[in-house]
Amino acid sequence: MKDMMGLLKQAQAMQAKVQDMQAALEQITVEGHAGGGLVKITLTVKGQIRSVSIDPSLLKPEEKEIVEDLVALAYENARHQAEQIMEEKMREVTGGMQLPF
């Protein structure tokens, strides 16, 4: 019974750490780039877009498809960075244990 109480306390402590980490992740931002920096997207580690920056040289009707592709690439670049940060933070909280969330 004593071991069970210890496990329960550990689980509660880990849950609190995960909640704290999730709140902290909302404040961390990453910036994705494409086209040599002509397109930039800033988003939170949780995936919320904070800003999109497009160099004025790309704002021509004939560049529309290129801009669309670059925006998508910049987003994917930022999302990849966000996923890496989330994985790193989760490892810090769980001590490297693989959890199903």
UniProtKB/Swiss-Prot annotation:
Main subcellular location: cytoplasm
Pfam families assigned to the protein according to its UniProt record, in alphabetical order: YbaB_DNA_bd
Localization terms from the record: Cytoplasm, Nucleoid
The keyword DNA-binding belongs to this UniProt entry's keyword annotation: yes
Description of how the protein assembles with itself and partners: Homodimer.
Similarity annotation: Belongs to the YbaB/EbfC family.
The name this protein goes by in its record: Nucleoid-associated protein Bind_0255
Organism: Beijerinckia indica subsp. indica (strain ATCC 9039 / DSM 1715 / NCIMB 8712)
